[in-house]
Amino acid sequence: LKENFLDHKNILICTNAIFSENKVKEFFFVKENSITKLGKHWASGIGSFNKQHILDHKSKRFNITEDDIEKIEIEFITFDNLVDNYKIASIDNLQIDVEGAEFEILKSINFEKISVKSIQFESKHFDGTFFEGPKLKFIKEKLKSNGYNLVQLDKENILAKK
């Protein structure tokens, strides 16, 4: 990734994951050789901090097992640390699709510290798949109280725009 963007001085590559606290966590994903074995190219996009989330994709045509899952450790930093480390004052468009951790990231953003013009995020995993519960309601209220208008783009995604 770094090599692809060497000529783009306005792009900064951060190898940390963003979360609500600084810590190291295990990340689970489908092994490369299992993607071929399972016969589903889209399996390469399945990753989670919860192994069970991956196993829940099991169906008659997608017979994934624990042997198909690999894990690595990832260092997390908070959104505020990212902003501080890279001296970011504003963001035009923030896109968040992190397989269920959207709530933790959005909850941790300090809108008094950084200006974000628009935020698009996947909302389907906040309170259970496609269920609007207290977590999603909390984030919607936080965004509205910080001057954002919310648009439901489809059944999975919301756009918050100033």
Stretches with model-predicted labels:
Residues 1-162:
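Phosphate/nucleotide-binding beta-alpha loop and adjacent structural elements of enzyme active sites
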